From Swiss-Prot:
Seems to not be involved in heat resistance. Unable to mediate restriction of long-distance movement of the pathogenic tobacco etch virus (TEV) without causing a hypersensitive response or inducing systemic acquired resistance. This is Inactive protein RESTRICTED TEV MOVEMENT 2. Belongs to the small heat shock protein (HSP20) family. Residues 163-206 are annotated as: 3 X 14 AA repeats B of [IMA]-[RK]-K-L-Q-E-E-A-K-A-K-E-[EK]-[LA]. It comes from the Eukaryota. The lineage of its organism: Eukaryota, Viridiplantae, Streptophyta, Embryophyta, Tracheophyta. It is a single-pass membrane protein. It comes from Arabidopsis thaliana (Mouse-ear cress). Residues 14-121 form the sHSP domain. A- repeats lie at residues 129-133, 135-139, 156-160, 206-210, 211-215, 216-220. Residues 346-364 have a biased composition (Low complexity).
Length: 364
C-alpha cells in the first residue's frame, strides 16, 4: 500500500497527521505472514488488537512530531479463514512489524494443481479488497466521529458565548440600576439638605426680624420715658420759677404817699388774699405734682415690668393699650399744670397793675 499523510486539527492546539504504512502479505505452507513498514515508530508507540466479531486485526499507533504535531495510523487487516487465531503472534524488528498467522492445515504448494493456485490468488485478492473496504469504512467512521466532536465542541463554544453574553448583559443592567438608585438617593439627599438649609435661613431671618422689632419697641419705650421725664423736669423748673416770683411779690412792701411823706406799709388784706390765692394754686399744683409723681413712679415700675416682658416676648395687647393710656394721662396732667400756671401768672399780672398805678399818685 502507498503511504499518504493527512493533517487534521482537534481545535485544542494539537494537529494530527494520518500516516498510512506500507503492508505486504506472504503465503507460506505453514502460515500466512503480514509485514507492515512502520518507520519512525517505536514498539511502545503501537498496538495490535484482534477483533473476534469481525475476525480482523487492528494495528494502531501515534508518535509526536515538531510544533505540536502528531503522526498516527489506524490499519485493519482481515485474518484468513484457514488460520489458528489463538496462535497468532507478532514481532517488531528493523522498523517492520511482522504478524504471523499459523494455518490449521499445512498445504503443500508444490503438489497443488494450477486451479488451486488460481483460487488461492483469487482468495488473496478478495481478502485484500475486503481489507481495503474495511479500512475505508473505518476511516470514514473515524472522520464522522471527528466531525461530530468538532460540531459538539462548536455548539458548546456557542452555548458558552451565549451564557457569557447573557451574564454580561445582566451585569450591565444591574450596574445601570444601581447607578440610577444611587443618583436618585443622592438627589433626595441634596433636596433634603437644601430644604433644611432654607428652613434654617428662614428661621434665622424670622428671629432677626423679631429681635429687631423687640429692639424698636424697647427704644420706643425708652424714648417715651425720656420725653416724659424731660416734660416733668421742665414743668418742675417752671413751677419753681413761678413760686420764687410770687414770693418776691408777697414780700415787697407797698409804698403809700401821705402829706407827711411816704411810708411803706404792707397791706394785709390784699396780701392775705393774694397769699390765699397763691396757696390755692399751690395746692392744686402740689396735688397735681403728687399725682404726677405717683403716676410716674407707677409708670416706671410698670415700664420696667413691661420691658422685662418685652425681652421675654410676653407683652399682651392690653398691656400695650395700658402703656398708651399712661402716656396720654401724663400728657394731660402736664397740660393741666401748664394751664394753671399760665392762668395764675396772668391773674397776678393784672392785679399788680392797678396797685402800682394807685401807689404812684402823689397828693396835691
Amino acid at each position: 500500500m502507498a503511504a499518504r499523510q493527512q493533517q487534521k486539527g482537534t481545535g485544542f492546539g494539537v494537529q494530527y497527521e494520518d500516516f498510512v504504512p506500507k503492508s505486504e502479505w506472504k503465503d507460506q505452507p505453514e502460515a500466512t505472514i503480514l509485514n507492515i513498514d512502520l518507520t519512525g515508530f517505536a514498539k511502545e508507540q503501537m498496538k495490535v488488537t484482534y477483533v473476534h466479531s469481525s475476525k480482523m486485526i487492528r494495528v494502531t499507533g501515534e508518535r509526536p512530531l515538531a510544533n505540536r504535531k502528531w503522526s498516527r495510523f489506524n490499519e485493519v487487516f482481515t485474518v484468513p479463514q484457514n488460520c489458528l487465531v489463538d496462535k497468532i503472534h507478532g514481532s517488531f524488528k528493523n522498523n517492520v512489524l511482522t504478524i504471523t498467522m499459523p494455518k490449521e492445515t499445512i498445504t503443500k504448494v508444490a503438489y497443488l494443481p494450477e486451479t488451486s493456485r488460481t483460487e488461492a490468488a483469487a482468495l488473496e485478492k478478495a481478502a485484500k479488497l475486503e481489507e481495503k473496504r474495511l479500512l475505508e469504512e473505518s476511516r470514514r467512521k473515524e472522520k464522522e466521529e471527528e466531525e461530530a466532536k468538532q460540531m459538539k465542541k462548536q455548539l458548546l463554544e456557542e452555548k458558552e458565548a451565549l451564557i457569557r453574553k447573557l451574564q454580561e448583559e445582566a451585569k450591565a443592567k444591574e450596574e445601570a440600576e444601581m447607578r440610577k438608585l444611587q443618583e436618585e438617593a443622592k438627589a433626595k439627599e441634596e433636596a433634603a439638605a437644601k430644604k433644611l438649609q432654607e428652613e434654617i435661613e428662614a428661621k434665622e431671618k424670622l428671629e432677626e426680624r423679631k429681635l429687631e422689632e423687640r429692639r424698636l419697641e424697647e427704644r420706643k419705650l425708652e424714648d417715651m420715658n425720656l420725653a416724659e421725664e424731660a416734660k416733668l423736669k421742665k414743668i418742675q423748673e417752671r413751677k419753681s420759677v413761678d413760686e420764687s416770683g410770687e414770693k418776691e411779690k408777697i414780700l415787697k412792701p407797698e409804698v403809700v404817699y401821705t402829706k407827711s411823706g411816704h411810708v411803706a406799709t404792707p397791706k394785709p388784706e390784699s396780701g392775705s388774699g393774694l397769699k390765699s390765692g397763691f396757696g390755692g394754686v399751690g395746692e392744686v399744683v402740689k396735688s397735681a405734682e403728687e399725682k404726677l409723681g405717683n403716676l410716674v413712679e407707677k409708670e416706671k415700675k410698670m415700664g420696667k415690668g413691661i420691658m422685662e416682658k418685652i425681652r421675654r416676648k410676653e407683652i399682651t395687647s392690653e398691656e400695650k393699650k395700658l402703656m398708651m393710656n399712661v402716656g396720654v394721662a401724663a400728657l394731660v396732667i402736664f397740660a393741666l399744670g401748664a394751664y394753671v400756671s399760665y392762668t395764675f401768672c396772668s391773674s397776678s399780672s393784672s392785679s399788680s397793675s392797678p396797685s402800682s398805678s394807685s401807689s404812684s399818685t402823689k397828693p396835691e
